[in-house]
Amino acid sequence: KTYPYINVTVGEAFPRIMLVRSMKKDKAKYFGPYTSSQSVRDIIDLSQKIYKIRSCNRSLPKETGNYRPCLYYHMGQCQAPCQGYISQEEYHENVRQMLHFLGGNFEPVIQMLTDKMYAASEKMDFEKAASYRDLLNSVKQIDQKQKITSSEMDDKDVIAFARDKDEAVVQVFFVRHGRLIGR
């Protein structure tokens, strides 16, 4: 097995997000490599819940309206571009925000989820507030896992090298906005 990557198919009319094991020369954006495939799945699940990015393999917009909306639409985790329920411009704005999030910029998401949680609780919609709280905790958990100690908030690629007389090892770390996002 090889290390997992997050693939966002930005070359498609309605991009998808998925876990892949290798990078290809295509129009997709890749994040990684990551050491834990479970972490990648958690990040993908969280991204789909927050930004409602599709996970189906339908060829859009060619197949728009040919099928019923999937279960993810009914669970509120997809905006059903397969049915034309969201415009391509709105969908691309969600993808742009998700790419920002995947790049390590968590603050706007934390603020948005906090605001929605408080608004839902003021409307006495405690189930919705609890779901926003859970999403908020997931984002904070990912944020904490990716903290590094650097006073500079620059983007860096760090290469570490160690050897002894028989072996050598090289490790590459990707730092974005002062956070370790991959290695």
Where are these regions (language model features)?
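Acidic, glycine-enriched active-site microenvironments
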Residues: K1-R183
